[in-house]
């Protein structure tokens, strides 16, 4: 996998691992492994809550001496269905995912080379850039979007001039 795909998968793995019900003093919700990179329509989701991590826009900052920073947007969609107060439930899910992002440290991931070998990498920074919900428009369903910017530095490549 390349950097973009590997970072998104590492985020899926982190959310799934942290919100597995083993830390009831840290998280309101247990996702029961309902986290992936796949998006579904509400009717296609069999178990709620469900979290989907997407690969968004990537921008780069090129610096002297061949250094560069890459900034990858990861839109995280949170789906839920609640019989009582869907907005309150969505806010708890958003709070849990924000906790995962804010307290998890650097995001470690593995990148594959064309020859099949792999090498470990690390995203150095994650920033939550926006959070929005449907504000009850989809009741009894609920949808929230959390946009996260992940900053990483790809391996330095020699300059050919």
Curated annotation (Swiss-Prot):
Keywords: Late protein, Viral genome ejection through host cell envelope, Viral long flexible tail ejection system, Viral penetration into host cytoplasm, Viral release from host cell, Viral tail assembly, Viral tail protein, Virion, Virus entry into host cell. Its main location: virion. GO terms for cellular component: virus tail. It is found in: Virion. InterPro entries: Phage_tail_terminator_p142. It comes from the Viruses. GO terms for biological process: symbiont genome ejection through host cell envelope, long flexible tail mechanism; viral tail assembly. Plays an essential role in tail assembly by capping the rapidly polymerizing tail once it has reached its requisite length. Homohexamer. This is Tail tube terminator protein p142. The lineage of its organism: Viruses, Duplodnaviria, Heunggongvirae, Uroviricota, Caudoviricetes.
């Amino acid at each position: 996998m390349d950097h973009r795909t590997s970072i998104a998968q590492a985020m899926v793995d982190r959310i799934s691992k942290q919100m597995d019900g083993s830390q009831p003093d840290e998280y309101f919700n247990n996702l029961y492994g309902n986290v992936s990179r796949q998006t579904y329509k509400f009717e296609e989701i069999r178990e709620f809550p469900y979290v989907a991590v997407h690969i968004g826009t990537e921008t780069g900052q090129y610096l002297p001496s061949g250094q560069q920073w890459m900034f990858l947007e990861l839109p995280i969609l949170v789906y839920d269905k609640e019989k009582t107060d869907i907005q309150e439930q969505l806010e708890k899910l958003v709070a849990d995912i924000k906790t995962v992002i804010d307290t998890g440290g650097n995001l470690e991931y593995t990148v594959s080379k064309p020859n099949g070998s792999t090498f470990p990498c690390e995203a150095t920074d994650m920033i939550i850039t926006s959070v929005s919900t449907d504000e009850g428009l989809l009741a009894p369903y609920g949808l929230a979007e959390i946009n996260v910017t992940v900053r990483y530095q790809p391996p330095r490549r020699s300059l050919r001039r």
